[in-house]
């Protein structure tokens, strides 16, 4: 079991053959060492029991039933008086069957095999470290090419013949075909190397510190050279410099993590615990097996065949040995990553086998589905809709979701207030949805934030905390300003809601994760809570109006609307008398009484500085009254003057939408100013 306080992180990397052997081997009480899987069998077809030394062997991986060996004998687990601790007939230990979830085995490969992730995945780590083309290394791994061994003191047979013009070339044109298996082994050990063994030799001979020094020197030399004038050559230099940087970073990573490069070539192949690749019996007596079992069987079959060729058959041609090594390499490649070399392997029903990579990667892989994205308690999920009346730090939680998330808190409240005698009575009151339940739920939610998360959580603002309030319906209401942080919109997106339980989690949600405290982007510092989409359209409709300027009102009658205070002139067009209001409250009151529309033009008395008015602007019209006062009408404002040309008041031409928008901004500024004054 992993202790969460001692282990804060999990790292996946390469391990040595010695470490694989330490994981998989164990010494049973009679002194026998077990752990190697040598047979490609699973269960016996008659007894329906695991085969010895097979993929489900109970000696290697532990008993199927706790305390029961393969013979059927039973021992009490943990009883020190009972002896022995294992069955002398079958060699199975009397332990808990849960050991089959973590006890590993191993396959001892007759020939080394490269790990396909480090060879075929881009960038190829093996090609980067060896500074050789990937195509040549692939030919070397799959026995299409051979590698000449560097023997300094003795001249090699092939070099004397002139068979090797290059370090790596096709073995068909360099190796004599008359060698038998016995002679071929001696010849190959002296003259050439092919397959993954050649890669392992080259990786083992590397000095990572020298690689870093040489790469740095070459990078500096390329940097000192100026442009050649040839575009193609300049591009080659840039690509070479980028490659040298990647090579140095890779070598530094190997040094920093104490990983040897030759570990990218496998000599021991780990076998997963049986419970992670089960065989299940379904209706009708049929068996369903994990695809990995079949892929392991192919590896064992081909590995055993290669062992027989090298040990029992003394007259096997060298070509056949190389072909069998290639088959072992391909079988391991299919086990680790099916389809990485081209066409994936399929079963009899033309279905692609799921390899180890398919099991762990992707949305339905072991990590994202079981470890990272598993279901948790005190969480829910629903569609989000806009909540126009919500504050920035609030969210609307449906009653159905809220009562489920806070049910334990409501039960505790009912019992504390002596409204329920026990948990059963409290649950029945919740099922009956009594009014007191909603009152207690409101009290609980007032001091308890919730976390909203929208997948995928690509940055810190993908999960934020809110103060929940109860809403009707079955959807989560959200303030539209927080959508940009979540990268959400209201076209059917779903969000998950979580309840922080511990005091530490609640404090973190309040101090660090509240939406009104995350107004800036953590990446670039720009405002993240900005109006988008629906809000921009709403602001446009709110402030656009139907007419622009007094001229359109008087001389463009085609765009008019009918209002309650309209009169018809003899010219057969309708003229709308625009109402006057002393303050914004009267204008909004008239709108609520449906006397004017949201975009109806009106005159609003305003405290405007005379210096703002352009002195050169000429009024469009001047209306005189009987007492000598007159009105100067401009495009967007109106001035009432006396006979002595003194300003009585100023009216601006606006709409109810503009007034509402201005009042919201004014209230926000006043609230911000008050908050700043409290802080100081």
UniProtKB/Swiss-Prot annotation:
| Highest rank taxon of the organism | Eukaryota
Q: What is an example of a GO molecular function annotated in this UniProt entry? A: magnesium ion binding
The UniProt record gives the binding positions of Mg(2+) as: 489, 491, 493
Record-linked Pfam families: RNA_pol_Rpb1_1 (PF04997), RNA_pol_Rpb1_2 (PF00623)
Its cofactor is: Mg(2+); Zn(2+)
Documented EC number(s): 2.7.7.6
Binding, Zn(2+): 69, 71, 87, 90
Cellular compartment(s): Plastid, Chloroplast
Q: What role is this protein assigned?
A: DNA-dependent RNA polymerase catalyzes the transcription of DNA into RNA using the four ribonucleoside triphosphates as substrates.
| Protein name, entry field | DNA-directed RNA polymerase subunit beta'
Name the gene behind this protein.
Answer: rpoC1
């Amino acid at each position: 079991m992993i202790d969460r306080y001692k282990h804060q992180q999990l790292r996946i990397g390469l391990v040595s053959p010695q470490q694989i052997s330490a994981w998989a081997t164990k010494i049973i009480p009679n002194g026998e060492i077990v752990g190697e899987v040598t047979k490609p069998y699973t269960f016996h077809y008659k007894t329906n029991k695991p085969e010895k030394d097979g993929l489900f062997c109970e000696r290697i991986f532990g008993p199927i039933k706790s305390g029961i060996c393969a013979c059927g004998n039973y021992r009490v687990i943990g009883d020190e008086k009972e002896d022995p601790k294992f069955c002398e007939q079958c060699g199975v230990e009397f332990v808990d069957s849960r050991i089959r979830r973590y006890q590993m085995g191993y396959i001892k490969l007759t020939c080394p095999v490269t790990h396909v992730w480090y060879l075929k995945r881009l960038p190829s780590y093996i090609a980067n470290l060896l500074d050789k083309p990937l195509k040549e290394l692939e030919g070397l791994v799959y026995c299409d090419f051979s590698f000449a061994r560097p023997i300094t003191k003795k001249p090699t047979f092939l070099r004397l013949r002139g068979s090797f013009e290059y370090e790596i070339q096709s073995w068909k044109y360099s190796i004599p075909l008359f060698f038998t298996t016995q002679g071929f082994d001696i010849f190959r050990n002296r003259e050439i190397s092919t397959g993954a063994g050649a890669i392992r030799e080259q990786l083992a001979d590397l000095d990572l510190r020298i690689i870093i020094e040489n790469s740095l020197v070459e990078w500096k030399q390329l940097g000192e050279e100026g442009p050649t004038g040839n575009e193609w050559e300049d591009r080659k230099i840039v690509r070479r410099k980028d490659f040298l940087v990647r090579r140095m970073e890779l070598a530094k990573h190997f040094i920093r993590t104490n990983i040897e490069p030759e570990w990218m070539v496998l000599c021991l192949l780990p076998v997963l615990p049986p419970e992670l690749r089960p065989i299940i019996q379904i209706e009708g007596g049929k068996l369903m097996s994990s695809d990995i079992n079949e892929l392991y069987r192919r590896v064992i079959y081909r590995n055993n065949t290669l062992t027989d060729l090298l040990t029992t058959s003394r007259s096997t041609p060298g070509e056949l040995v190389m072909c069998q090594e290639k088959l072992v390499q391909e079988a391991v490649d299919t086990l680790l990553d099916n389809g990485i070399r081209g066409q994936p392997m399929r079963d009899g029903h033309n279905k692609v086998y799921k390899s180890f990579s398919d099991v762990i990667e992707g949305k339905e892989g072991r990590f994202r589905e079981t470890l990272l994205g598993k279901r948790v308690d005190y969480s829910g999920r629903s569609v989000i809709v806009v909540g126009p009346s919500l504050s920035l730090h609030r969210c609307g939680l449906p009653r159905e979701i809220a009562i489920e998330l806070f049910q334990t808190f409501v039960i505790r409240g009912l019992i504390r207030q002596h409204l329920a005698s026990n948990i059963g009575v409290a649950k029945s009151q919740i099922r009956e949805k009594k009014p007191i339940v909603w009152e207690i739920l409101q009290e609980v939610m007032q001091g308890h934030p919730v976390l909203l998360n929208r997948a995928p959580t690509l940055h810190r603002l993908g999960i934020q905390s809110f103060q929940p309030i109860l809403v009707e319906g079955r959807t989560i209401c959200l303030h539209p300003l927080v959508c940009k942080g979540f990268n959400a919109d209201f076209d059917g997106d779903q969000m998950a809601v979580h309840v922080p339980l511990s005091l530490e989690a609640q404090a973190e949600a309040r101090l660090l994760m509240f939406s009104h405290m995350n107004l800036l982007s953590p990446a670039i510092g720009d405002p993240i809570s900005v109006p988008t989409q629906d809000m921009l359209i709403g602001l446009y409709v709110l402030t656009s109006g139907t007419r622009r300027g007094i001229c359109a009102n008087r001389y463009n009658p085609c765009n008019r609307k009918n209002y309650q205070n309209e009169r018809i002139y003899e010219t057969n067009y309708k003229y709308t008398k625009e109402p006057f209001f002393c303050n914004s409250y009267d204008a909004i009151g008239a709108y609520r009484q449906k006397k004017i529309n949201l975009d109806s033009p009106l005159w609003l008395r305003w405290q405007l500085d005379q210096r703002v008015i352009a002195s050169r602007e000429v009024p469009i019209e001047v209306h005189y009254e009987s007492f000598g006062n007159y009105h100067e009408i401009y495009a967007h404002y109106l001035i009432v003057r006396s006979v002595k040309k003194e300003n009585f008041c100023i009216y601006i031409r606006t709409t109810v939408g503009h007034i509402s928008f201005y009042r919201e901004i004014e209230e926000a500024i006043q609230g911000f100013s008050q908050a700043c004054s409290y802080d100081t």
